Amino acid sequence: MVNTYTSYRLIAADITKSLERVSAQPEVQRETEYYLENIGNVKSIEDLVEDRRLFAYAMKAHGLSDMTYAKAFMVKAMEGGIDDEDSFVNKLTDQRYTDFVEAFNFVRNGEATTAFAKTQQGTVDKYLRQTLEEDAGDSNEGVRLALN
């Protein structure tokens, strides 16, 4: 059994190669292809949360996969946007929600929201990193935490 430090060093030594291995996994490839093919069709908050695969992909990318079931909560967070300091998401202490709303800021950007790189490739990059961390954590939780 490889210890936490050694596992972490193996992954971190060539993070690019590690991410390439993750992106080559069949399930990751399928979900990423679906996301990139369909995210451009999303024009509203409702469109995003109604497409279960797109919403789950975006949530996982931001480390929020455990909250995918809470669609009403996420709709409330997105409807308030991030520009108003009194908005719902700005009152939350977990930065992941703010990052999610920033990436999918329909309040500020309207229908153009999903045309931005941070919503397309930026979300894919985060998804790959999150998947890498989760996969590493399956065998050693310490490695997942170190990669985070």
Predicted regions and their residues:
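General marker for long, soluble alpha-helical cores
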Residues: 1-48, 53-148
